[in-house]
Amino acid sequence: MAFALLRPVGAHVLYPDVRLLSEDEENRSESDASDQSFGCCEGPEAARRGPGPGGGRRAGGGGGAGPVVVVRQRQAANARERDRTQSVNTAFTALRTLIPTEPVDRKLSKIETVRLASSYIAHLANVLLLGDSADDGQPCFRAAGSAKGAVPAAADGGRQPRSICTFCLSNQRKGGGRRDLGGSCLKVRGVAPLRGPRR
């Protein structure tokens, strides 16, 4: 019996308009936005009055074309920030499509997405190391037990509750459903198992 390991489709294939920024580009975008003057919010009277009580000149506030330059810089910074925010949101959308959730159409917040992705990566690492064909369908618990030796005792002398992997629990609830399909949690999301007609 042979099994094929299916790889998930990369986000760049599903979302070709997503451009990954390097850390330097992201930091530059953020610092550019924070370095800009907020002179665009002032009225024309404030621009004619000149510098405020603090004396000195503002960045970009000198000369007759100063307010226009400041407005353009602010608009450019806003456009960069919109693009950055859109690319982050698109990346989160791509990540959400790769993480199994119950119910399937559940909307995850950004922090839930990051936490669930981290948990799912740990689960898949345990599946790769140990396989998911354990009797109880919980390879993550087996990995935690073998790493710690046993479930640690609580301060009051009792045993602490065992840690539960969401994905192992989901597998266990579904019974042998995934194991019947080849015993792998590594199926590409979106490929539904063949089911008989509903009654």
From Swiss-Prot:
InterPro entries xrefs: bHLH_dom, E-box_TF_Regulators, HLH_DNA-bd_sf
Gene Ontology molecular function, alphabetical: bHLH transcription factor binding; DNA-binding transcription activator activity, RNA polymerase II-specific; DNA-binding transcription factor activity; DNA-binding transcription factor activity, RNA polymerase II-specific; E-box binding; protein dimerization activity; RNA polymerase II transcription regulatory region sequence-specific DNA binding
Pfam families from the UniProt entry: HLH
Compositional bias segments (type: Gly residues): 51-66
Region annotated Disordered, chain positions: 25-67
Keywords assigned by UniProt, alphabetized: Activator, Developmental protein, Differentiation, DNA-binding, Nucleus, Transcription, Transcription regulation
Keyword Disulfide bond in annotation: no
Subunit structure as annotated in this protein's UniProt entry: Heterodimer; efficient DNA binding requires dimerization with another bHLH protein, such as TCF3/E12. Interacts with MEOX2.
Full protein name: Transcription factor 15
Organism: Homo sapiens
